[in-house]
Amino acid sequence: MSMIQNDWLDSIGEEFHKPYYKQLYDFVKEEYSQTTIYPLAENIFNAFHFTPLSKVKVLILGQDPYHNVNQAHGLSFSVLPEQKDIPPSLQNIYKELQSDLGCFIPNNGYLKKWADQGVLLLNTVLTVRAHQANSHQGRGWEQFTNAIIQAVNQQDRPIVYLLWGKPAQSKIPMLTNPKHLILKAPHPSPLSSYRGFFGSKHFSQTNEFFNANGLEPIDWQIENI
């Protein structure tokens, strides 16, 4: 697993030396040697490489990585640019963006443009076996990503959390910073999107919050490639 090299280390570097992380590292290393694991090992920490802690403006919390080929690359909800089949949840995110902000629906699901603007696309579990959803739950990633969430909570500037679905919303007790905005909605999955994800207007609300605080809004439009 590639190490984190940027300012995240100042806040969460000690996690790498804790007993749980040693067990997690050994487990994940063994899994990669025995079977197909997503994302590629060098992409596990892409969310942190692309979005340094000092640049975080939005946190979008997912669960575990996509588990089919050419999908996961370390950013929640995002897929590799060569993947032309956009996952259903991301299709629904794009539909809401179109309804909310008038964004056109792009031909890809590569969300690095968001990450580059300070949108931390974080999954609570960072690895998964091919074709086995949730197969790396309960192995230690949750403790590690809780430390990430706590580090974001400590940042003394306006930040928005987009929490879609009950697992993401279970983190709300950790979010105590009065300068931060929490937006909740059902998950964009086809199973739940019609219960209130559609029409939630989280993207325009996020930008209104930044405008009110004198900050640059997010350009949510993903371009065609």
Swiss-Prot record:
CDD domains: UDG-F1-like. Its EC number is 3.2.2.27. One of its GO terms (molecular function) is uracil DNA N-glycosylase activity. GO terms for biological process: base-excision repair, AP site formation via deaminated base removal. It is an enzyme of class 3 (hydrolase). It comes from the Bacteria. Keywords: Cytoplasm, DNA damage, DNA repair, Hydrolase. PROSITE patterns: U_DNA_GLYCOSYLASE. The active site is at D64 (proton acceptor). GO terms for cellular component: cytoplasm. It catalyses: Hydrolyzes single-stranded DNA or mismatched double-stranded DNA and polynucleotides, releasing free uracil. It is found in: Cytoplasm. It holds the Pfam family UDG. Signal peptide: none annotated. Excises uracil residues from the DNA which can arise as a result of misincorporation of dUMP residues by DNA polymerase or due to deamination of cytosine. Belongs to the uracil-DNA glycosylase (UDG) superfamily. UNG family. This is Uracil-DNA glycosylase. It comes from Lachnoclostridium phytofermentans (strain ATCC 700394 / DSM 18823 / ISDg) (Clostridium phytofermentans).
